[in-house]
Amino acid sequence: MSRTGMPVINFINFNQTGTCISMGTSEGLKIFNCDPFGRFYSDEDGGCGIVEMLFSTSLLAVVGIGDNPSMSPRRLRILNTKRHSVICEVTFPTTILAVKMNRSRLVVLLQEQIYIYDINSMRLLYTIETSSNPRGLISMSPSLENNYLAYPSPPKVINSGIKSNANTNNIGISARSSIAEGGSEYLDKGTEPLTDSSKAGADLNSVKASTETTISPGKEHSAGSGLNATSSSGTVKNGDVIFFNLQTLQPTMVIEAHKGEIAALALSKDGTLLATASEKGTIIRVFSVETCTKVYQFRRGTYPTRIYSLNFSDDNEFLAASSSNKTVHIFKLGKPNAENSSAAATNSDDDEGEADSDDGADDDGVGDSDDTRSTVSIESFDNGSHQTREPIVDSSRKTVGRMIRKSSQNLSRKAAKALGSYFPKKVTSILEPRRHFASLKIPIESGSNLKTICTIGEPLTLDISDYPELFSGSRTMAQSASISANSSDSSLTRNSNFVKMIPIRVVSSEGYMYNYVLDPERGGDCLLLSQYPLLMD
């Protein structure tokens, strides 16, 4: 229990579609529906450290925190919430750091191993030996058409009498030798074979609740085997990411995403794009899974910060990033073209080491944090056409710092635009890198260690008359009609009382869900519609 007498939140996440929230606390687990908001399942059998959903089905993957023997952090339990029963249990050699699922595969991440299962039979298909991954970073595509796994792979230091300071970036490791090493590690750990192979291959729904198996390695694959992980410069690259095909059970490519260690990574819902952020948190990069090339690069802000989550919209139009400064930045991707790909590819990793200029909407400590609902400034609505409308400005976040920063950035952009006509595209892309399209700031003052997870929902239509305090000001019906008539592809519909928005949902480690909306055409500040407590009964 916390000091306030409330349960401690150990884990919180959205499901694959962003429509449900799974939460593990010191007392048990809870499952919530996002829209309409409400709790529809809870269990208080013991503290939970991981609670993952399979879309919106009744299947849950649960890992305990060790407060009682049945809730060991090394034991994975597959639950059926409709029947309130345990389908099966699997015990691993070390603590489970992450569990990911789609409709064909279940992946379990330990600190130095990844286990891949057929989710329909819980049969162990593959074991991957990886470099140490204490943060439990891993991403799995929900799509079966592009069934990929992405995980960081910093170099492993090798005790070599042939080459000093050897690691997996500067020495080649054959698949045979790496598998042999992996096998010897398992022998040292004393891992036993499956206690009942017939149960391991049985259908998931037919396994009895009391079934418990102890894993043994199936096929093994070292993080460096079969891949060209050697750096051309001979320097150690800590920001490597491996793509692994979960259908063919083969690694496909290693990409050098960043110079520093990876802090966050996420595959898009269709499995075609990968977003990454390093420990510094100032640069967000997006890669094509098919070509393994960098297609977008964004600057989040000036000062280093920890990126906690990355999330793509369903159509890959937007990318959201939540960070330790209680902000969420939304970047607009659009459709990648040759110019975007060229500009992203020419931006070197050295950009991340430079002093980045912030876009002014948000950075560490920027913006007011009051508990009142946000209101849209009248300045953000004009009578002009869709092409000239300014981004939405949240009046509750107007500060002197933001005004000064906005003025300086406008001057910087004008200078970059003027100089850009005299320089090649490579130099222009460095002078004027892409910034965030919209942002929001969680309305709390405390919580320096606040962690947030964000997701982008499907577009919705709002009746502005339902939110008079949100869309306040002297915006008349005539103004609305004028804007609507002049914007054939705008976010406003033909009916001036309605506006098309994109929901941005954020959950925090303090136990709240925040519902924001984003104007997909104008961007700017996201508007807070509602917030709900997750720990209250």
From Swiss-Prot:
Location of the region described as Disordered in the Swiss-Prot/TrEMBL record: 184-230, 338-411
Compositionally biased intervals (Polar residues): 207-216, 374-386
Top-level taxon in the UniProt lineage: Eukaryota
Motif, L/FRRG motif: chain positions: 298-302
The entry's keywords: Autophagy, Endosome, Membrane, Protein transport, Repeat, Transport, Vacuole, WD repeat
GO terms for MF: phosphatidylinositol-3,5-bisphosphate binding; phosphatidylinositol-3-phosphate binding; phosphatidylinositol-4-phosphate binding; protein-macromolecule adaptor activity; ubiquitin binding
Biased segments, Basic and acidic residues type: 387-397
Cross-referenced Pfam families: PROPPIN
Annotated localization: Preautophagosomal structure membrane; Vacuole membrane; Endosome membrane
InterPro entries: PROPPIN, WD40/YVTN_repeat-like_dom_sf, WD40_repeat_dom_sf, WD40_rpt
Major localization listed first in the record, in broad terms: membrane
WD repeat locations: 257-297, 302-341
GO CC annotations, alphabetized: cytosol; endosome membrane; fungal-type vacuole membrane; PAS complex; phagophore; phagophore assembly site membrane
Membrane topology, record value: Peripheral membrane protein
Subunit structure: Component of the PI(3,5)P2 regulatory complex.
Role this protein plays: The PI(3,5)P2 regulatory complex regulates both the synthesis and turnover of phosphatidylinositol 3,5-bisphosphate (PtdIns(3,5)P2). Necessary for proper vacuole morphology. Plays an important role in osmotically-induced vacuole fragmentation. Required for cytoplasm to vacuole transport (Cvt) vesicle formation, pexophagy and starvation-induced autophagy. Involved in correct ATG9 trafficking to the pre-autophagosomal structure. Might also be involved in premeiotic DNA replication.
Domain-related comment: The N-terminus might form a beta-propeller domain involved in specific binding to phosphatidylinositol 3,5-bisphosphate (PIP2), leading to the association of the protein to the membrane.
Family note: Belongs to the WD repeat PROPPIN family.
Stated name of the protein: Autophagy-related protein 18
Organism the protein comes from: Eremothecium gossypii (strain ATCC 10895 / CBS 109.51 / FGSC 9923 / NRRL Y-1056) (Yeast)
